[in-house]
Amino acid sequence: MPPAMSLVIKNLHARVKDGAPILNGINLEIPKGEVHAIMGPNGSGKSTLSKVLCGHPDYEVTGGSVSLDGQDLLAMSVDERSRAGLFLAFQYPVEVPGVTNANFMRAAMQARLPKGEDVDAVSFYKELRGRMKQLGMDTKFTARAVNEGFSGGEKK
């Protein structure tokens, strides 16, 4: 299981690139191991906050700070943020024909390794099958293409 993370947002201000301010003084602290839900009415900034944290190019941070496990999140590239474990899960995930769930997960693990290191295929599949057995999941899910033939909940 990946290590728990802490997220600290202090007085975060952001705007749409070349546009109007959209986040004004957001403060939030999520300690390691806690799970929080960001809730609010349409237009309150939930998606914008998520996109700003992930480094979406349509938004510009104009003030404040954000740290993830003590590291300056705003100084990280989009790629570094994803490798640190920050990502968006879409409400309606797209299907990716031709890419199996197993290959997708292996590629995700590979992306987190230092350059030149490889995920050993035999070890990976052995570990994957073991984890799926622990969770009571049918291993046939690994052979399906990403999100193909899954219910909405399974996709997420």
Residue ranges of each PLM-predicted region?
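Walker A/P-loop
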Residues: 47
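Helix-to-loop junction immediately C-terminal to a conserved catalytic motif
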Residues: 54
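Conserved structural motif at the start of ABC-family nucleotide-binding domains
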Residues: 7-9, 23-25
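ABC-family P-loop ATPase nucleotide-binding domains
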Residues: 94-156
